[in-house]
Amino acid sequence: LTSINPVTRKVLRRRLAKKTLPWLSAALPFVLLICVAAFSISFALHVEAQQKGKLSKPRQLDKGITWQRDPVTGELNLGPGLINGSEGEKSGEPRAGVIGSATVRLVPVTCSVLGGDSAVIKGLNSGNFRVYDDEVERPIQYFSAPSSDPARVAMVIDASPSVFPDSVQMRGAESALVDALAPNDEVAVVDFAAHTFLQVGFSSDRELLHRAIGRVDVRELLGDTGGSNIYEAVYLTARQLFSAPRGPQAIVLITDGEDSGLGLTTDPASAAPPAGPRGMSFDRLTFEDLARTLAAANIQVFAISTENRPKIMTAAWLAKHADATLVTPDARKLGIPPYTLYLAELVRRTGGQLYFLREAQSLSDTLRQIAQRVSAEYLLGFTPLPSTDSDAPHRGWHSLRIEVVGRTDATVVHQAAYYVPATR
C-alpha cells in the first residue's frame, strides 16, 4: 500500500476492514475457548502431578486399637480400632498368606538361592525346587521367579532417643534401599518410639519416599519419647500394610533391639502367650504372636542392629542354630543380651538376616545388600498337608525344607517354619 496514493490507500483499508472484522468477530469465541481449554488441561496436569507426589500427614497405626485374645483358640486379634491398610483384614484375625486362585489356598514361601561365593543364583524354574512340609514332599503349584512380580518392602525405623547417637549415620542413608530396588518395587516407611507412625504407604514414587524418609527424625518434636515399642511396630506394620503376596514381602527393621513393651528375657516363657484365667495380661501382644503373624503371611525380617555383635553370634553359629529356637536360659551364659537375642530369633523364624551397623562399612552398603537379595528371591506356593479329619491344614507350626536339585553348590535360605492360625 505504500506505493499507492494516500486517498486510494485509505479506501482499500476501509474495504479490507469491512471484510476481515466480521470474520475476526466470529472466530474470537473459538480462539478464547481453545485458550481456556489449554489452560484448564495444563492446570489439571499440574494439580495431578502435585497430588501424586504429595506427602500426607503421618498416620498413627496404634491409635484406638485394642488387643483381644480368643479364649478358645488362643489367637490374638485386633479390636475395632484397627486401621485396615489392605483388603482382607476386616475380621481382625491373624491372616495366613494366600496365593493362587480364590478357591485353592496355597502356602507361600519366599527363598533365596546362594552359590558357593554367597552370590544369589537366578534363572531357576519350578522344576529346580523341592518343597517339604513336615518332611513330606508337596507339589509346587505356584512359582514366581525373581523380578517377575514387584517386591514390597516396609522400612520400620526406630526413632526413639536410645538410637540418637547413631542417628547421624542412619538419617539419609535409608534412601539407599529405595534407590537399589527395582523401579516397580514398592516401599513403605514406618517409624516408631512409644507409638507407631506410617509416614507413607507402599509406593514406587522415589521422590515421595525420599521425602518420607527425610522427616523420620522429627519424632522428638512430636513429644513421643515414652519408650520403644519395637515389636508392636513390626506387628502393626505386618497386619495393616501387607496383603496377599504376589512377590517377595519384607520388613527392614533398623533398631537397637531394646524393646520396652513386651518384657522379654532369656526365659522362653516371657515370649509366649499367657496361659490360665483371663486377666489384664491375657489380652496383650507377645513375641510369639508376632512370630506367628509374620510366618503366616510370609513376611521376612531383615534386622539392622545399632548395637555390637555378641562375640559368639558369628554367621557360622547362627547357621548352626537355624532350626532351633535361640531363646534359652543359656543365652545369658553365652553373653547374648535379650535385645539382640530376640532380633536374631525373629530373623531366624522369618528367613531374613541380621546385620550389625557398627561392623558394616556403612548403612547404605547394608541396605543395598538387602535390596539385592530381595530382588533375587523366588516365591513358591504349595498346598499344605491336610489334617486327618478334614481337608483343612493342621493348625499350628509346620516345619519347612526347600532343596534345589541340579546345583550342588546351592544353599537355600528360607523361613524355618510356617504357621496356620487356629480358628473356631
Describe the predicted segments one by one.
Residues 1-27:
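N-terminal secretory signal peptides that target proteins for export/translocation
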Residues 5-9, 40, 148, 246:
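Residue-level detector of transmembrane insertion/anchoring sites
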Residues 12, 16, 39-41, 46:
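Intrinsic disorder/low-complexity segments
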Residues 27-42:
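Bacterial N-terminal signal peptides
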Residues 45, 49-424:
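Scaffold/interface architecture of coatomer-like assemblies
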